[in-house]
């Protein structure tokens, strides 16, 4: 039995660690984070320089111990994240620099499910962030198309006021259909509700005579009326000159506890039909916006709070904030929101040149998957805890490198790559984990897009080229390059090659047409002139080699010796 590697201070016993000249298997079983971090940092150096250490790790159980560290997850502390990162680098060094037998052991130990989880989480996070970034850019760009009106105005509004209100509502109508199926809590936390972080957004309309109130009555102008359902019924009271909800004042508990309250300021002077209208949107706190109407001496303050989609990037004029369900049961009208989101998608076409569009990401996704709208909405729930589980760029690069080396010529290991599971403990969101079978080549093909770094594109293309290699153990046959087709050649040169790269083969025109959107990103063009020049250079080299073998002494003689010998012979004859 191996002795447990623990540090006992009162017995003057130190834990066993690994250094640059000594490897001890017990150091990987240490429960101290600091000593384990120190041992793994030295093990990274040993696995990159010593072939003997790489072989020993696959025999004494050290490789399985590293895999268990990777499956356990990163954790939330700096020490656990560093230990996870060092363990991944050790496994990558063993798989890249090891022999064929060592690479097979690494694949059998379970490195492919870990890489599958990293790649899919990275793509999922990138799609979510890009979709929110595109909405944020759209909210900053001026829009000329007015939002769809769901109900007619109860009184004539001047064009200046209507344009100003439309500009405010357009900033708030950029909600996509990804968020209409549920409430999204705020990712900024409850600390933003303090008094020091209060923001005030106001829109003042000071033209006299712009608003006319018929019959000396006021009305309740709800913000973004098309998002309110039929449950918010209102009633007119001409004697008091106010409009309010029926169920807001009947139950005192609703008025005291519900965040949706109406405060009425009475005045003895009546309101005039033509007066100065000041519309102020005051956001006192991030969770309690207020809408204030002041008509002459009489004023009425209405605090409205309705459900709205919460963005990861806050818009400058966001007067709609998220709230919890109150006793009023304010419900969203799904049809209006979907039609409004459809119009917003049509207007959200101008993005920054350096940011990839959402359509480009969705085109690169695997064919059989549909974008999970609920998953994208849940990605920003508790984002501060998920940021530690977000795959880094070096993690993606390490994963692609080890896949490129382990999928090279090992065709008997293809089932590990084409039918792999994920690791639920490594997932950022529990909604992404499941019993689905993943094809690693379908995930890797998405990293051949142009906006990825050149190193990521290089290794992704190398993996896709390995997928199209010929199987020399079965007579040099190739597989159809369509990722959804599993046909192999019955004999060599049965399938037709791609005309551009002359590497991939397809069993039919349908497979080539179906696989071309993905294959076009990693298809390298081979020019005929280049191939002819290579052939000519090979012929010239073969001719020179034959001449050198025929007369080896002639190549040793300098260039000017023939003229010298001929001149001496002529002198002797004279």
From Swiss-Prot:
Residues 542-556 have a biased composition (Low complexity). Keywords: Cytoplasm, Cytoskeleton, Metal-binding, Nucleus, Zinc, Zinc-finger. It is found in: Nucleus; Cytoplasm; Cytoplasm, Cytoskeleton, Microtubule organizing center, Spindle pole body. Disulfide bonds: none annotated. SUPFAM superfamilies: HIT/MYND zinc finger-like. InterPro entries: ARM-like, MYND-type_zinc_finger, Znf_MYND. It comes from the Eukaryota. Pfam families: zf-MYND. Residues 243-253, 283-301, 562-574 have a biased composition (Polar residues). Signal peptide: none annotated. Residues 207-253, 283-307, 534-574 are annotated as: Disordered. GO terms for cellular component: cell division site; cytosol; mitotic spindle pole body; MUB1-RAD6-UBR2 ubiquitin ligase complex; nucleus. Its main location: nucleus. One of its GO terms (molecular function) is zinc ion binding. A zinc finger (MYND-type) spans 482-523. Zn(2+) binds at residues 498, 501, 519, 523. One of its GO terms (biological process) is establishment or maintenance of cell polarity. Belongs to the MUB1/samB family. This is MYND-type zinc finger protein C31F10.10c. The lineage of its organism: Eukaryota, Fungi, Dikarya, Ascomycota, Taphrinomycotina.
């Amino acid at each position: 039995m191996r002795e447990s590697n623990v540090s006992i201070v009162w017995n003057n016993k130190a834990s066993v660690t690994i250094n640059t000249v000594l490897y001890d298997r017990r150091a990987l079983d240490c429960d101290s984070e600091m000593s384990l971090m120190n041992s793994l940092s030295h093990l990274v150096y040993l696995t990159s320089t010593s072939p003997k250490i790489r072989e020993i790790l696959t025999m004494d159980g050290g490789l399985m111990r590293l895999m268990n560290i990777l499956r356990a997850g990163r954790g939330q502390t700096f020490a656990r994240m560093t230990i996870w990162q060092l363990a991944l680098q050790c496994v990558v060094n063993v798989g890249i620099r090891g022999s064929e037998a060592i690479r097979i052991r690494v694949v059998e130990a379970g490195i492919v499910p870990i890489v599958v989880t990293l790649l899919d989480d990275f793509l999922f996070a990138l799609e979510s962030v890009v979709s929110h970034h595109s909405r944020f850019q759209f909210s900053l760009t001026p829009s000329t198309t007015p939002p769809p009106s769901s109900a007619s105005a109860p009184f004539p509004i001047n064009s200046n006021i209507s344009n100003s209100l439309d500009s405010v509502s357009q900033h708030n109508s950029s909600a996509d259909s990804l968020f209409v199926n549920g409430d999204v809590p705020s990712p900024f936390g409850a600390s933003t509700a303090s008094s020091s972080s209060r923001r005030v957004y106001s829109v003042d309309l000071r033209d006299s005579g712009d608003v006319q109130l018929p019959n000396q009555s006021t009305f309740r102008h709800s913000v973004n009326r098309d998002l309110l359902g039929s449950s918010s019924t209102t009633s007119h009271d001409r004697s008091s000159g106010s409009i309010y909800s029926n169920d807001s004042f009947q139950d005192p508990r609703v008025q005291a506890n519900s965040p949706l309250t109406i405060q009425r300021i009475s005045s003895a002077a009546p309101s005039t039909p033509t007066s100065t209208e000041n519309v102020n949107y005051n956001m006192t706190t991030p969770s309690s916006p207020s809408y204030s109407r002041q008509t002459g001496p009489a004023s009425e303050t209405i605090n409205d709070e309705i459900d709205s989609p919460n963005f990861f990037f806050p818009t400058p004029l966001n007067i709609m904030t998220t709230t919890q369900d109150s006793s009023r049961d304010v419900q969203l009208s799904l049809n209006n929101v979907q039609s409004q989101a459809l119009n917003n998608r049509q207007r959200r076409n101008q993005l920054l040149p350096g940011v990839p569009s959402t359509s480009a990401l969705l085109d690169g996704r695997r064919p059989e998957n549909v974008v999970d709208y609920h998953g994208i909405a849940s990605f920003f729930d508790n984002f501060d805890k998920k940021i530690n589980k977000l795959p880094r760029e070096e993690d993606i690069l390490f994963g692609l490198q080890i896949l490129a080396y382990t999928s090279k010529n090992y065709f008997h290991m293809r089932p590990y790559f084409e039918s792999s599971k994920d690791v639920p403990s490594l997932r950022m969101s529990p909604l992404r984990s499941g019993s689905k079978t993943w094809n690693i080549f379908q995930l890797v093909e998405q990293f051949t897009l142009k906006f990825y770094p050149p190193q990521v594109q290089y290794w992704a293309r190398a993996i896709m080229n390995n997928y199209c290699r010929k199987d020399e153990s079965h007579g040099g046959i190739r597989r159809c390059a369509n990722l959804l087709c599993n046909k192999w050649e019955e004999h060599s040169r049965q399938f037709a090659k791609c005309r551009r790269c002359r590497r991939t083969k397809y069993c039919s025109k349908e497979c080539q047409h179906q696989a071309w959107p993905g294959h076009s990103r990693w298809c390298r063009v081979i020019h005929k002139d280049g191939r002819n020049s290579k052939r000519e250079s090979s012929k010239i080299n073969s001719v020179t080699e034959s001449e050198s073998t025929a007369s080896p002494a002639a190549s040793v003689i300098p260039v000017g010796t023939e003229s010298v010998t001929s001149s001496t012979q002529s002198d002797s004859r004279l």
